[in-house]
Amino acid sequence: MKNNHIPVLLNEVLDNLALKENGIYIDLTLGMGGHSKEILKRIPKGKLIAFDKDDFAIKNASKTLSEVANNFEIIKSDFKDFKEELSNLGIYKVDGILADLGISSPQIDNAERGFSYLKNSALDMRMDQSQKLSAYDVVNLYPVEKLEYILKTYGEVKNYKYIASKIIEARPINTTLELANLIKSVTPQKLLKLKNPAKNVFQAIRIEVNNELDSIHQMLSSVEDLLKVNASLLIISFHSLEDKIVKNYFQELTKPKLPSKMPIQEDKFFATRRIYPSKQELNLNSRSKSAKLRILTKIKD
């Protein structure tokens, strides 16, 4: 398969990782290998450890990276477990960590994966094809209260109670377009002009299937001790739920830990403001539109 994937905010990632040729770097979301490939080119004496739980992504990215160098290792794992996986390799400190959150373009574009509300497929949405829970299970087996919670919390769907009740009434729902068309049919005409109403519903179901937000929380809890001094954590997010988790974590690590009257202590971490794609990148890659990059740098042990 030809890899036409365009990595988001690539130059900004490479600049802010401050790559050292002998450094150890972690890509928590390998995907099609776009970021990892460029990192590898710049660390000839270093090591790249990349994580993904999607077999399709791992297979294709492995070929991409092998064309550049062999000083990398790919681990099939949810990034929430990355600290344990690194420990198994004897790695306890790293020079930089990157996470490009959410769904990848190939996952959307491959209709058979069931992520797209524009292409017909079985309801799937599993990033890890070996796991049992799928979108079909969420749509057809969850009780109405749990559906309501998912739609409200993970999709920020305004009419979440109504949508959940209509999903229950229409069961069984077998395909992505069945679900998308159902949502469209029960959405007021004036709202249809704003955006496809299935977008947020599909987002909510996908997040539930892949346990995405809990994984982000668990991943972040492992970062603090792994970063060397002057090493950075870079996180690209694409929607407000992800970004809020990252923002709150960064604020927690950078805010003063002592009462104001206590002796001043130097901060251990420094966080930058969000970085957005340039106009040039937006013109080349429209899917980068909602991307935001946050950077946390460790400045003291």
Swiss-Prot record:
It catalyses: cytidine(1402) in 16S rRNA + S-adenosyl-L-methionine = N(4)-methylcytidine(1402) in 16S rRNA + S-adenosyl-L-homocysteine + H(+). Its main location: cytoplasm. Its EC number is 2.1.1.199. SUPFAM superfamilies: Putative methyltransferase TM0872, insert domain (SSF81799), S-adenosyl-L-methionine-dependent methyltransferases (SSF53335). One of its GO terms (molecular function) is rRNA (cytosine-N4-)-methyltransferase activity. It is found in: Cytoplasm. The keyword Ribonucleoprotein does not apply. One of its GO terms (cellular component) is cytoplasm. PANTHER family: 12S RRNA N4-METHYLCYTIDINE METHYLTRANSFERASE, S-ADENOSYL-METHYLTRANSFERASE MRAW. The lineage of its organism: Bacteria, Bacillati, Mycoplasmatota, Mycoplasmoidales, Metamycoplasmataceae. This is Ribosomal RNA small subunit methyltransferase H. GO terms for biological process: rRNA base methylation. Keywords: Cytoplasm, Methyltransferase, rRNA processing, S-adenosyl-L-methionine, Transferase. Specifically methylates the N4 position of cytidine in position 1402 (C1402) of 16S rRNA. S-adenosyl-L-methionine binds at residues 33-35, 52, 79, 100, 107. It is an enzyme of class 2 (transferase). Belongs to the methyltransferase superfamily. RsmH family.
